[in-house]
From Swiss-Prot:
Described function: Core subunit of the mitochondrial membrane respiratory chain NADH dehydrogenase (Complex I) which catalyzes electron transfer from NADH through the respiratory chain, using ubiquinone as an electron acceptor. Essential for the catalytic activity and assembly of complex I.
UniProt GO MF annotations: NADH dehydrogenase (ubiquinone) activity
Catalytic activity: a ubiquinone + NADH + 5 H(+)(in) = a ubiquinol + NAD(+) + 4 H(+)(out)
Gene that produces this protein: MT-ND2
Membrane-protein topology: Multi-pass membrane protein
Organism, scientific name: Mammuthus primigenius
Pfam families from the UniProt entry: NADH_dehy_S2_C, Proton_antipo_M
EC number, as in UniProt: 7.1.1.2
GO cellular component, one term: mitochondrial inner membrane
Protein's cellular compartments: Mitochondrion inner membrane
Assembly and oligomerization: Core subunit of respiratory chain NADH dehydrogenase (Complex I) which is composed of 45 different subunits. Interacts with TMEM242.
Record lineage: Eukaryota, Metazoa, Chordata, Craniata, Vertebrata
GO term, biological process aspect, one: mitochondrial respiratory chain complex I assembly
Transmembrane segments: 3-23, 25-45, 59-79, 93-115, 150-170, 178-198, 200-220, 240-260, 274-294, 326-346
Annotated protein name in UniProt: NADH-ubiquinone oxidoreductase chain 2
Amino acid sequence: MNPLALSLILTTLLAGTLITMMSSHWLTAWMGLEMNMLTMIPILMKTTNPRSTEAATKYFMTQATASMMLMMALTINLMYSGQWSIMKMTNPVASNVALMALMTKLGSAPFHFWVPEVTQGVELTSGMILLTWQKLAPLSLLYQMATYTNTNLIYLSGLLSILIGGWGGLNQTQLRKILAYSSISHMGWMLIILPFNPTLTLLNLAIYILLTLSIFMILANTLTTSMSSLTLMWNKTPAMTIMLMTTLLSLGGLPPLSGFTPKWLMIHELTKNNSIIMPLTMAIMTLLNMYFYMRLIYYSSLTILPSTNNMKMTWQFTSTKHTMMLPTLITLSNMLLPLTPMISMLE
C-alpha cells in the first residue's frame, strides 16, 4: 500500500475512534463509528485476493447493518424524548436496539458470526487491528450507556459469548480463528461486569489488548498462521516459542500471569454483589478456552518434529521484522499480577 495512503487511513482511523470516545452527542459518535468502519475496509484489503475481498465485504455488510440499527434507535429516541445526549436515552425500545447494534459492532454473541470469518480472511496485522483497536469505540459508548441499559440482555449476551467463544475454538486449526473466538469470549467477560463496575471493563479491555497484541506480533514475526506451522516454531525460534506459550497461558487467565488479574477482580466484584451462580458459570465455561490454549502450547513446544541441521539453521535466513515493542509487551503480559492490590484500590 502507498505509504501516504496508509498514513491517511491510519490517521482517519485514529480520529474516528477519538471522536466517538470523546463524544456525548449521538450524532457525532455515529459519525466517528462510520469513519472507523470506512477506513477499516482498505486495511482489511491490504493484500488483494479473493479471501480478503470476501472478508472486507462481510465486514462492511455487518457494520453497515449495525449502523442502520443504531441510527434507527437514535431516531426513535429523538421522537420520544427530543434528546441527542448519550446519557439520556430514556426510551426502552431505542435503548435495546442501540445495545444490539453496538453488540454487533463488538462481535459479541449472538451477533458474532462475522468475527471468525473476517479475521481468517485477512492478514495478521489487519486481524490484530480488527480484534483490538476496533473494540474501543463501541465499548466506550456502552460504558456511557451502562446506567440505563437492559441488564438482562447484557448478561445473556455475555454468557453466550463466553460459551460460544470457548466452544467454537475447540475444533479450529487456524490460529486467526482461534484468536477470534478468544476475542468473543473475552468480550463476554467485559459485558457481564459492565453494569456492576464499568472500570473493571476498561481494565479487562486494556489487558486483553495487551495480550492479543503480543500474540499477533509473535505470530507475525514467525510467519505462523496454522497449527501445522506452529509445530515448526521450536526448531526455528525457541525464544519466541517460550514467549508465545506464557502469553497464551496469560490470555487463558492462569495465575500468576497478568491475564488472571481482571478475572480475579471481576469474580470478586460479582460475589461482593451476592451473585454466586454467574461467576461460577463463567469460570467453568472459561475452561473451554483454557483447553484450546493448552492445545496450542502442546503443538508449539511439546510436539517437536524430527529435524536436520539445515532445518535448525532456517531461522537465520528467515526475514523477520524485529520490533522493540515486543519485549515490553511480553513483560507486561506476564508480570502485572503483583499490581492487583494497587489496581483494586483505584476502583
